[in-house]
């Protein structure tokens, strides 16, 4: 058959081509994501297509070719001149260049264009066939002889890109990466292909929207009326610091980026002002700081504060144009696979393994100027890790004496940001000074004592920074499990053997966690599925599995190892549902204390809710293995616990407040019952019980020695150890009581919803009133003790001095044992001597006569002034 003559089927296609194009245009309007696919039919010669190199001329063309990075890349370079453009395939072994004959051939055959239908059932093709078909379609798109068809298809593809440009920054990056990894052609950057990097830094002097004189601000970034990003909420702060970075895709520069600030409340968000940025005024490839003044035409405030942010506008590099092949089944399979791989790599990117620990000891401040602040504290930040020191009263040389541990990564050590903050009497926070430390410039395994001068403030901070390498953290598959290798396990066990107890005391042990699978998870998506992944937390150490998409019974089969710094830490395994650029949805959680781990045994754990108090939907299968040194663990027990990273402060919750009040009541009731038991012994309510108690008291006090105190505590431990079943039953009963309390709380909430808001207010008022009374009693007791020694009431102070003098003489001549015996005999025989006597505590009775500070003000006598004379007032009325 002569290949130069078109077939009958080809001639029929050639005649019906205008009708097919018009039909495809109508379909493209309905579904702009499906562009028209055109092919060119070429005469076959000794090569398969233009994109396949002529191996006979490869040696002659190689010196003139262009370099190529590797065979795995599918990027094809297209020159700017489309009329003479040749598509050059790249090879890892040689570089090729098109000859003039090939260019003439490509131009000559540009007129033979018609649509080609491929087999839709073929999902996979050979690499040569993929390269041939792709290069053929790429050539068609750049032939000048296509006339109107090529620009129309180009516009359709750009319309599709316009739709993609309105997505979030995370999806935008995934699509661009997908374009690079799939078969595509490079074009000049499109006018809408911009990326805007926003660094939301802080707010200053924002308006008050809460009754307490503060606000809970957060920021929204809007473009064309759509919210592209929402920041986190900073509670009770008029000078919030967000320090958040987001990358947004920009469709056109003829737009305004709206920045709106809101105050978060329980029912609605109050508006705190807005500002805008004209995108066309931004300079390309340059980071500029913008201080945006907030305004609200409906508000009476003149100054609503400012928002400080950095903006950087860049042209998106590598703006590729994707073309859908007619083989839709094959494209959808490859696209979904690529997206899944991209999401997987993104998830694994978050699981960076740290290489060591940065131990920072905040010693003190020197000559720190606090201004009108009454309290001071320090914030430390390294990447996403944050710590906050304890708050001290204002002092020129505050002594913090605190230690914080950061993770460091060898590839990005980063800068340690240190900020000194102050609080005034109204609890408004203000940044006093800052300083920075380049961690990469510090030597390893060495204590670095640094005195860091503060910027924008007088004074300095004295700190001790130590960098210690860490090798105990890893993520692997089940086939390369570290503890499965006997030699490696023996080596790890030897490292934590008893003879190495005094070597590297901070390295207590190592934990291996096998995250096997989960089952029957909660469906978080509208499709009835979830995209679950696991987050493992041990103290401040966090590792994460990859995401299993569209599955309620995922199998991760990953192995994680953690270095143990405290044997009393708790491993928290949380299952989340990945939700794109939004916060992940909660699917369940389980907490496992390290000391409760049974080595090497697979366990099935029932997932709990966020508060870890009730069962949630789903199960998770874990296998835990723990190796540690008991001596190191014991030494670590008597050192301060590791501080947790700074998290968002918890807001007032009626449920939590009520629960805590009930807990205090139960403890107080237990103490009160113990006191009542001793009082019943003194009151001789039961003759047998009081007699036994009196005899035990006499024998104990007469034979008492100091070593008997720890011995009595040991007997208490032994008593509880010999009755484990009863102890377990009591603990189970306590947990059931807590669950019952929660169920009662839920029922009360339902009832309160029926009763209305008045009952809720009364319930909260009752709780707050109880807390208020307890605090008042505690404060009054402490103030009365202080006022005894301050001679507030001279009679009581003189009486106390007389009693203390007599007590001193008695203790000097009479042993303490006899004094306690006399006191006990008096207590036990008081009811026998006087059956109608009222039991009392003499010390508390004495202190009740001393006024508190509030009573001192109430009892103080006001001086009579002439203007306040009652006679003068009567005369003025006359």
UniProtKB/Swiss-Prot annotation:
Binds Ca(2+) via the C2 domains in absence of phospholipids. Residues 20-40, 143-178, 728-752 are annotated as: Disordered. The keyword Repeat applies. One of its GO terms (molecular function) is calcium ion binding. GO terms for cellular component: cytosol; membrane; nucleoplasm. It is a multi-pass membrane protein. The keyword Repeat applies. Residues 149-161 have a biased composition (Basic and acidic residues). It is found in: Membrane. Residues 177-292, 334-452, 486-607 form the C2 domain. Ca(2+) 2 binds at residues 210, 263, 265, 270. Belongs to the MCTP family. PANTHER family: C2 DOMAIN-CONTAINING PROTEIN, MULTIPLE C2 AND TRANSMEMBRANE DOMAIN-CONTAINING PROTEIN 2. Might play a role in the development of cardiac outflow tract. This is Multiple C2 and transmembrane domain-containing protein 2. It comes from Mus musculus. The gene is Mctp2.
């Amino acid at each position: 058959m002569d290949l130069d003559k078109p077939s009958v089927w080809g001639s029929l296609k050639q005649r019906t081509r205008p009708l097919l194009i018009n039909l495809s245009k109508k379909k493209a309007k309905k579904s702009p994501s499906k562009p028209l696919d055109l092919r060119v039919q070429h005469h076959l010669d000794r090569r398969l297509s233009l994109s396949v190199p002529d191996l006979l001329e490869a040696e002659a063309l190689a010196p003139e070719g262009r370099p190529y990075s590797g065979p795995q890349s599918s990027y094809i370079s297209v020159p700017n001149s489309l009329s003479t453009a040749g598509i050059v395939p790249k090879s890892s072994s040689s570089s090729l260049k098109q000859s003039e004959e090939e260019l003439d051939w490509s131009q000559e055959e540009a007129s033979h264009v018609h649509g080609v239908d491929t087999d839709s059932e073929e999902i996979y093709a050979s690499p040569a066939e993929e390269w041939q078909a792709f290069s053929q379609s790429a050539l068609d798109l750049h032939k000048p002889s296509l006339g109107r068809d090529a620009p129309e298809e180009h516009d359709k593809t750009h319309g599709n890109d316009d739709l993609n440009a309105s997505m979030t920054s995370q999806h935008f990056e995934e699509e661009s990466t997908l374009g690079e990894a799939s078969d595509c052609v490079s074009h000049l950057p499109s006018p809408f292909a911009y990326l805007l990097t926003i660094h939301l830094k802080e707010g200053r002097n924002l308006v008050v929207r809460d009754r307490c004189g503060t606000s809970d601000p957060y920021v929204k970034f809007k473009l064309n009326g759509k919210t592209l990003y929402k920041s986190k909420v900073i509670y009770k702060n008029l000078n919030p610091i967000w320090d958040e970075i987001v990358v947004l895709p920009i469709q056109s520069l003829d737009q305004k980026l709206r920045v709106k600030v809101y105050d978060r409340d329980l029912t609605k968000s109050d508006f705190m002002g807005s500002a805008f940025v004209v995108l066309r005024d931004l300079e390309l490839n340059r980071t500029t700081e913008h201080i945006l003044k907030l305004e609200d035409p409906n508000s009476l405030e003149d100054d609503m504060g400012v928002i400080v942010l950095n903006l950087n506008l860049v042209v998106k590099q590598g703006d590729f144009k994707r073309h859908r092949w007619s083989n839709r089944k094959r494209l959808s399979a490859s696209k979904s696979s690529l997206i899944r791989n991209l999401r997987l790599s993104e998830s694994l990117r978050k699981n960076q393994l740290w290489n060591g620990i940065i131990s920072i000891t905040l010693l003190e401040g020197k000559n720190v100027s606090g201004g009108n602040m009454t309290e001071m504290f320090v914030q430390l930040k390294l990447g996403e890790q944050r710590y906050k020191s304890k708050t001290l009263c204002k002092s020129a040389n505050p002594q913090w004496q605190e230690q914080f541990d950061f993770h460091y990564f060898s590839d990005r050590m980063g800068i340690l940001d240190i900020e000194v903050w102050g609080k005034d009497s109204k609890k408004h926070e203000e940044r006093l000074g800052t300083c920075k430390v380049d961690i990469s410039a510090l030597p390893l395994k060495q204590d670095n004592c640094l005195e860091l001068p503060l910027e924008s403030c007088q004074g300095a901070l004295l700190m001790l920074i130590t960098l210690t390498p860490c090798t105990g953290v890893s993520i692997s598959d089940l086939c390369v499990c570290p503890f499965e290798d006997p030699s490696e396990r023996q080596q790890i066990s030897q490292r934590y053997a008893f003879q190495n107890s005094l070597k590297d005391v901070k390295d207590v042990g190592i934990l291996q966690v096998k995250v096997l699978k989960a089952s029957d998870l909660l469906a978080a998506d509208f499709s009835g599925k979830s995209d679950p992944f696991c987050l493992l937390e041990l103290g401040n150490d966090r590792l994460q599995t990859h995401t299993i998409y569209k599955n309620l019974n995922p199998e991760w089969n990953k192995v994680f190892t953690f270095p143990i710094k405290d044997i009393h830490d708790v491993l928290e395994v949380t299952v989340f549902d990945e939700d794109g650029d939004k916060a992940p949805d909660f699917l369940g959680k389980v907490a496992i204390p390290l000391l409760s781990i049974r080595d090497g045994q697979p366990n099935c754990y029932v997932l709990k809710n966020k508060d870890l108090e009730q069962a949630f939907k789903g199960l998770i299968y874990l296998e835990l293995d723990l190796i540690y040194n008991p001596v190191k663990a014991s030494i670590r027990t008597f050192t301060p616990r590791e501080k947790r990273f700074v998290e968002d402060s918890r807001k007032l919750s009626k449920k939590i407040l009520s629960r805590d009040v009930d807990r205090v009541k139960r403890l107080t009731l237990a103490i009160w019952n113990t006191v009542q038991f001793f009082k019943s012994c003194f009151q001789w309510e039961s003759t047998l019980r009081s007699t036994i108690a009196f005899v035990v008291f006499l024998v104990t006090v007469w034979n008492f020695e100091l070593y008997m105190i720890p011995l009595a505590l040991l007997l208490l431990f032994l008593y509880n150890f010999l009755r484990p079943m009863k102890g377990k039953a009591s603990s189970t009963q306590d947990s059931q009581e807590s669950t019952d309390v929660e169920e009662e709380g839920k029922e009360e909430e339902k009832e309160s919803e029926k009763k209305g808001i008045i009952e809720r207010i009364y319930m909260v008022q009752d709780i707050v009133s109880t807390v208020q009374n307890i605090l008042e009693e505690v404060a009054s007791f402490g103030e009365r003790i202080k006022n005894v020694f301050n001679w507030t009431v001279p009679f009581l102070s003189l009486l106390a001095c007389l009693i203390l003098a007599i007590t001193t003489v008695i203790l000097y001549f009479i042993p303490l044992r006899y004094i306690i015996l006399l006191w006990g005999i008096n207590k036990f025989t008081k009811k026998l001597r006087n059956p109608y006597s009222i039991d009392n505590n003499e010390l508390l009775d004495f202190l009740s006569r001393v006024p508190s500070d509030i009573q001192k003000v109430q009892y103080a006598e006001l001086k009579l002034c002439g203007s306040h004379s009652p006679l003068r007032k009567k005369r003025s009325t006359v």
